[in-house]
Amino acid sequence: VNVVAGVDLGGTAINYTIVNEQEQFLIEGLCEHPALSIQGPEVCLAQIEDGLKIAVELAGVSFDDIVAVGLDTPGPASSSGVLSARGSTNFVHADWSGFDIRKSLEARLSRPVTYLNDGNAGALWGHFTIFGANSRETSVSAVIGTGLGGGVIVEGNVVKGRMGFGGELGHVLVPYQSIAGIDGLHPKCNCGRTGDLESLCSLTAIALTLLPYFLPRYPDHELAKFDSSKAAKFVRGMAEKGDPLCRDVFRVQAHALGLFFDEMVNTFDPDALIIGGGAIETGVDFQRWFIAETRRGMPRQRTEQADIPIHIMPNGDTAGARGAAIEALKFTRAR
């Protein structure tokens, strides 16, 4: 039996999945192993291999059944898997700088390895859940977490770009001045831009920008007693329960996302828009409210595009590994 493995290498943990040729995932939920990436590439690659042996056992297959491996990591990295000298958190060991993780893992496992960054892997998973692995459709995914990740899939293929920065959707500027109720707000992103999507639609945006802006309007609010980075973690749950301040925060996030999606509709004319990430890992009622607010934030669409579907990405924790596996499955089919 031929299977493909997906390996989602995070800063502290590696998440695995196994998929067969029928596009069935053989591991339900999370299969995690410590990454130890802080100790450098050699230790981390050994961890990836050790965890893979545990994953195949859990999936009920053997290591020899693996015909290809899909890997994803946080960026910045080239489209072929060479990690940037400006490594992300936990990839700070000197040996990671300029390290070709795809080629090195391929040599270690003696199998072809494909590479995506974690945002693009999540986007491919979201696309697959709607259209399957052999699709020719186009979709745009926004993944709302600590930052704003995501990706663009054009005619079934991930847009990686010349240097691997395709789909860095968080740093696309949006005309936020048109959002109601935020006069005088100047949302700044850690990248140096003012008014990109991440500066308004992320956990970081809640802590740095939106809570400090809205809290003075609610002087007796229970979140006022926390510092904003701690308070930010309560906003989603309170918004889901209907708290007016927290709904205001999520309304601004949804309207910013709507402005961004409008730009994507005009650029790609996609078949679907997809929202993922921890921000909307909520009950269905709140997800429906958030989608409706996102549509409300979009400028009026052409009649032909007005009914573009907006989906919620399922299986948030496993999205990276599953997207990476789909990329490797597509590779094996193209050979």
Ranges and model annotations:
Residues 48-69, 112-113, 261-273:
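Phosphate/pyrophosphate-binding loops at sites that engage ATP/ADP/AMP, CoA/4′-phosphopantetheine
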Residues 3-50, 84-88, 164:
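Short glycine-rich, Thr/Ser-proximal phosphate-binding strand/loop in the N-terminal lobe
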Residues 131-200:
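Glycine-rich phosphate-binding loop of actin/hexokinase-like ATP-binding domains
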Residues 36-49, 65-69, 75-138, 183, ...:
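Glycine-rich phosphate-binding loop and adjoining helix at the ATP-binding site
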Residues 193-272, 306-308:
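A mobile "lid/hinge" subdomain adjacent to the ATP/sugar-phosphate binding pocket shared
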Residues 4-8, 65-70, 139-143, 149, ...:
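Short glycine-aspartate micro-motif
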Residues 13-14, 264, 270-294:
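Glycine-rich phosphate-binding loops at beta-strand->alpha-helix junctions
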Residues 294-311, 321:
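Charged, glycine-enriched surface loops/patches
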